[in-house]
Amino acid sequence: MAEAFSNSLSRATGIVTTSSSGTIGVYANHLSGISTVGISTGDIVDNTNYLAGTKVTGFGATAGTVTVDRVSTNSAEATSQIVSFLGVTSCYTSPAATKSILISGTFANNTENSVNLSIEILDSSGPTAALLASKIPVPHGSSFVISDTGKTLLEAGDVVRVYCDSDNAIDVNLSILTGVS
């Protein structure tokens, strides 16, 4: 396959579900007392008691309980917590039997407020994902740019995914080189 440049565009990314009544135990890998409506496995947990990139792994046997992949950082139980769950938007998937290179990307804030953005690469060869950028603040009327100084190799089936802490807030433009051998 010949190498080719292409753009991958995603309009108005950002999916957020928020609960204001969460309880987080001491060094706990679960949250309780929240509505689980709209929350999905793989959503990022946005709360000061969890490290950036903490993800929902499932739902507890007790109603209103969410399990996560990391333990909380709080040393005392935290009640009445506002917890946001950031849903994923898949912005690019490397084609089958093809390697691609993420050359650059522009992530434009299309809201009237500052938003935070996280970018993740999902490795198709295993259920592993790693953040390329985490909780990057993007002010109103501005954008975040991944420049050409650091390129990211994407193997067949790898996915570039975006999370944002505001609904429909980020427009994504990725520049990709496909057909790399």
Region annotations inferred by a language model:
Residues M1-I15, L86-E112, Y163-S181:
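C-terminal interaction-tip segments
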Residues V16-G87:
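Small/polar beta-strand repeat architecture
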Residues G33-T36, S90-K99, T152-L154:
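Extracellular and analogous surface-interaction loops
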Residues D46, S84, S143-V145, R161:
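Hydrophobic beta-strand signal
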Residues N49, D123-P127, V180:
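Solvent-exposed strand-loop boundary residues in beta-sheet-rich modules
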Residues L51-G58, L153-G157, A169-L174:
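Short, Lys/Arg- and Gly-enriched loop/turn segments at beta-strand edges
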Residues S118-L122, N173-S175:
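Beta-strand signatures of extracellular beta-sandwich domains
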Residues S125-V159:
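Intrinsically disordered, low-complexity Pro/Gly/Ser/Thr-rich segments with frequent PxxP/GP/PP motifs
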